[in-house]
Regions:
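Conserved, structured core segments of small domains
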Residues: 1-82
């Protein structure tokens, strides 16, 4: 499994429905939301087998606007030998 940063932008008008759909698909507790600060975007860190699987955490109505960015964590010892 790989770690992904999920970025799920939506509009003010879509907000309530997006949050409810995120709850319905089981990912609400994975997300942190910028909506109350005027940034209508959900952010999450999840594990998935690939990008397509990671994108399933975003409701279908806005999935095309979302991103799943594969992440790595660098090992300090390996970095010393670069």
């Amino acid at each position: 499994m790989q770690k992904f940063m999920i970025i799920s932008p939506h509009t003010h008008d879509e907000c309530t429905l997006v949050v409810k759909q995120t709850l319905a698909i089981g990912y609400l507790t994975h997300f942190w939301w910028g909506c109350k600060s005027g940034d209508h975007t959900g952010y999450a860190m999840i594990e998935a087998n690939n990008t397509d699987e990671a994108l399933l955490s975003i409701p279908t109505m806005i999935r095309k606007k979302g991103k799943a960015i594969g992440l790595v964590q660098f090992d300090p010892e390996k970095v010393k030998h670069w």
